[in-house]
């Protein structure tokens, strides 16, 4: 015959402690929504079907997939830094997985790279894969490189996010953002978890000012793409370029572009003119509102769910990037209307021009 006992606790001493224990237990059982992140491109469709766990996941209908951009973690987004995270490799088949919702990206990329013999480095996008739909700046890189491999993969195992599809490889001329795919596990299946439906919009929607969405394409030329000796030029027009540096923000490049146009510093011959920016010029101009919405926590999050085989078990400390504090006399960065203020911030000074390898190079 079994014996049942009840643990008695001193009433006064443990009353408050036991109350909080009950609250924690009830809260955990009622509101637990674990978040599993696929961090290394190893997802198989069958894996998701197998993720039926006791007390957490009774149906795959409780899973909601979300695309999370890497730039929210504070990775460097300038073209020279971003492209170093990608590399060509053969013998690995591409994988594609869909996601239901994503976030707006500040920086996206679009590559058109050819081999020295003129053949294409990157494959065309398969049917159904469209460019990432929400990019403030699209960095479009054209040029040449050895491209020693069949596909361009992410060296850190992240995905390339397209329009509701994430791929392990880069497709030619198709805009993408870097990111990972995360699964939200809901307490119960909800059809309307994401209230807004995917947008069905015309290709030229960004030209409509009423859409409330503004995207700018910034063009670059690359030589030796994918090597340690890659050189990048920011394209002002088809004859005028600026030697690109990692410290240049998209906003600075747009200011520089407008300054060169309005001050008549474009190439006035049939030759190629390459500018170099004075190292003393401050290039840290940016849109602080973007980082206000991307702040992450230094706190270590303990992830507990049945997706444990798909993400790292060791909790990682998120990188925090805080916006540059504004002085009392400063205001938030505004959209450019005129070029007067930018001419003051980027003084044009003429230095001696030299001809190198048949190209005229000057310093600003």
From Swiss-Prot:
The record marks 324-325 as: Cleavage. Disulfide bonds join 108-135, 121-147. GO terms for biological process: monoatomic ion transmembrane transport. Glycans are attached at residues 40, 204, 228, 238, 257, 268. Changing residue 246 to P: In strain: Isolate mouse-adapted. GO terms for molecular function: channel activity. The keyword rRNA processing does not apply. Keywords: Cleavage on pair of basic residues, Disulfide bond, Glycoprotein, Ion channel, Ion transport, Secreted, Signal, Transport, Viral ion channel. It comes from the Viruses. GO terms for cellular component: extracellular region; host cell membrane. Coiled coil: none annotated. Residues 1-32 form the signal peptide. Belongs to the filoviruses glycoprotein family. This is Pre-small/secreted glycoprotein. It comes from Zaire ebolavirus (strain Mayinga-76). The lineage of its organism: Viruses, Riboviria, Orthornavirae, Negarnaviricota, Haploviricotina. The gene is GP.
